């Protein structure tokens, strides 16, 4: 006999280009919009939790610690990239950074250009610039997150969506 265990038999996989990350200094939340890093090749989010074991006569007892989160971003360096410069200055000055993880494959039920998102605050904890003779310059960033993040919906402009993936363009001038 066949039993269903809430398996999503007809689910679709989400392409990596549909998950985008947007960044903004917390100090600029009333004056500026969040931006994506140009030429992103890979992003990731990790959540981990350590635990301690205590030996008892009945076996070990585990005590979970506090969850810690990190977001990583790898991109090719764009000439004159002001966002990367701004993020590095924020690292030097211990400034809090806002980060949105947005799923462009899941539009919100209401509102134009709104998508399922997770919001975080944290600090840039590592920046690495790698250059070799054969490839483009690569920039890797690591953000240490505070708290667990909050689920919600984020607005992603048409321009930001176009940064994430090629969008079809007509042969006529824009607005014609």
What are these regions (language model features)?
Residues 1-12:
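N-terminal leader/targeting segments
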Residues 10-76, 124-137:
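Solvent-exposed edge beta-strands and adjacent loop segments
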Residues 81-83, 149-153:
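Residue-level signal for secondary-structure boundary sites
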Residues 85, 136, 154-155:
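Short linear functional motifs in flexible/disordered or boundary regions
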Residues 153-176:
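Intrinsically disordered, low-complexity terminal/linker regions enriched in Pro/Ser/Gly
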